[in-house]
Amino acid sequence: MGVIEFLLALAQDMILAAIPAVGFAMVFNVPVRALRWCALLGSIGHGSRMILMTSGLNIEWSTFMASMLGGTIGIQWSRWYLAHPKVFTVAAVIPMFPGISAYTAMISAVKISQLGYSEPLMITLLTNFLTASSIVGALSIGLSIPGLWLYRKRPRV
């Protein structure tokens, strides 16, 4: 993949990630003045995850690092705009949730219950369930670590 193709794919990924970030921000009743920042943070998070995955990291670690970046930026923006950090961060990580792997695991579980046990279905179920669980864990831990670092009162050492 050339540089131009990568930059176009990155721009497309970031623009498409901004749409669900704004949508969920509107569902969560985020103030109108913060919607553009939710979109930008969703784009930054999803774009950084794509960059990390393109550079060779797996999706779980890329999601963890991207959510840490989003959490750190969200905390800084909350100080600038006098809002709670969750205003920016929660809606911004929604585009990184593992919808496809969770859906595939659920469909595999339904097929196992309808058709009976088969090894390929069980492998599909477990692989996708563990992937989805790892990504959700990476998102939650990655969002909480910047708050633990940046709001700490005692010395770090």
Swiss-Prot record:
It is found in: Cell inner membrane. One of its GO terms (cellular component) is plasma membrane. The chain crosses the membrane at residues 8-28, 50-70, 87-107, 129-149. Pfam families: ThrE_2. It is a multi-pass membrane protein. GO terms for biological process: succinate transport. Keywords: Cell inner membrane, Cell membrane, Membrane, Transmembrane, Transmembrane helix, Transport. Involved in succinate export with YjjP. Both proteins are required for export. The transporter is composed of YjjB and YjjP. Belongs to the ThrE exporter (TC 2.A.79) family. This is Probable succinate transporter subunit YjjB. It comes from Escherichia coli O157:H7 (strain EC4115 / EHEC).
